[in-house]
Amino acid sequence: LLMNGVPRPQNFDKDMKIDRNKPRGAADWEFLKKLRALWRGKLIIKGVLNPKDALKLERLGADAIYVSGHGSRQFDSCPIPIHQLAKIRSSLKKSTVLIYDTGIRNGEDILKALCSGADFVMVGKQALFSIAAEGFEGLVQMTNNLKKEIEIAMAQMGAFDINRLNAGHLESTLT
């Protein structure tokens, strides 16, 4: 971002207008089948909140499933993404890549997502706010803060390897 500026998707014309009041149901299952057949690159589908949809996407050949409520800014009544994450993970093959991004505010939120089955956790607003406030140094500080928060929370959880986190780490083992 700092080196090349804001990304500009090449498949959108700069004058393209989107009417947010019109239905956008053009990307149905048949469209995705055709897209997968035509597209040889990686296919990541974002906005998945239903385990049945995730399973269908896996069967259609999606390379990754991106669990996201889009910051919960577009549809307040959608299922809570972090509550759906473990359900989606359990419906998929272990080899299917699962990405998560909603509601990440600190290192503990990252750990919750990893324990719930995410392979990758994205941090959007935090990174943008950090860059806006302090430029590159803000991004470095944000990254260092998240790392420290993760280390502290893992110690509290009794977890020693971030690659071995699982749902059991979210439950207290003390009686």
Q: Which residues fall in each region the model found?
A:
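Residue-level recognition of oxygen-bearing side chains
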Residues: 53, 80, 109
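Short, acidic/turn-prone active-site loops that include or flank metal/cofactor-
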Residues: 70-73, 126-128
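Conserved, mostly hydrophobic/aromatic
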Residues: 35, 57, 65, 113, ...
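Active-site entrance/lid segments in N-terminal catalytic domains of soluble metabolic enzymes
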Residues: 1-55, 59, 71-74, 83, ...
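Conserved functional loop/turn residues at catalytic and ligand-binding sites
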Residues: 61, 69, 117
